[in-house]
A protein has these predicted regions:
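Extracellular and organelle-lumenal recognition/adhesion modules and their flexible linkers in secreted
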Residues: 1-157, 170, 175-177, 188-201
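Conserved radical SAM core fold
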Residues: 183-185
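Short mixed-charge
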Residues: 213-219
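A general structural detector for well-ordered alpha-helical segments in enzyme core domains, enriched
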Residues: 103-107, 161-168, 206, 210
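Extracellular/secretory pathway-exposed regions associated with glycan biology
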Residues: 34-36, 161, 219
């Protein structure tokens, strides 16, 4: 990953290391130059259970090829589990929390797009219906978003969810095209579907809810 001099990056991660007593140093390490360009030492009271840890790291210099490192200060051995590691720039497009990378968003803005679709095409269907994108699961705290294996061969974190999509449309003054599943999985990969009336009604209600979330009365 690349960092810019003076920019701040919010780190959030979860650790479970039963019995570990000691400090942790989190650092942005410049692999090309072999040096640390930003770090902070944490003093967790206990890691005997899953614990959320946060820090703000500021880059001392520009660096193109960096790693995030977690250095354990105590000697000895311990089993460590790590989950949900997020290093996010504070300087996002329009200052949005959990917003878009500024340079990418500015390039998109320069194209002056008239609309954007979300979540996409085939990913809406999913490899199977069970694998489809569920927009309600892309809302809220990014850590609680379940994510989904994508039929394109990688896992989607849902980090850019329905809410972020709507915000981005507002920021660029473009129309938002919400693509809904029509109770049909990808016909090329599986072709499963439902024609049960009660199940179809749930699909329709989900679409109505999405429209209401976007343009309905906020009260």
């Amino acid at each position: 990953m690349a960092v810019k001099e003076g920019e701040k990056y919010d780190l959030r991660f979860y650790l479970n290391a039963p019995g570990y007593k000691g400090t942790l140093t989190v650092e942005i390490y410049d692999v090309e130059k072999g040096k640390t360009v930003g770090s902070e030492t944490l003093h967790p009271a206990s890691l005997d259970h899953w614990t959320e840890l946060t820090a703000t790291l500021q880059a001392a210099s520009d660096a193109r090829h960096c790693e995030l490192r977690i250095v354990f200060g105590a000697s000895g051995q311990s089993v460590v589990w790590v989950d949900y590691v997020s290093l996010f720039p504070q300087n996002t497009f329009k200052g949005r929390k959990n917003g878009l990378r500024k340079d990418v968003a500015e390039m998109l803005a320069g194209l002056q797009p008239q609309f954007m679709r979300w979540p996409g095409g085939c990913i809406v269907e999913g490899a199977t219906l069970d694998n489809r994108v569920r927009w309600k699961e892309t809302l809220g705290d990014p850590m609680t978003r379940r994510g989904e294996w994508s039929l394109w061969g990688y896992r989607s974190t849902y980090g850019f969810g329905y809410h972020e999509f709507l915000q981005f449309c507002e920021d660029l003054g473009m129309e938002g095209m919400f693509v809904a599943n029509a109770a049909l999985g990808c016909s090329f990969r599986n072709g499963d579907y439902t024609d049960d009336p009660a199940e179809l009604e749930r699909y329709l209600q989900d679409i109505r809810d999405a429209i209401d979330y976007a343009i309905g009365d906020p009260s």
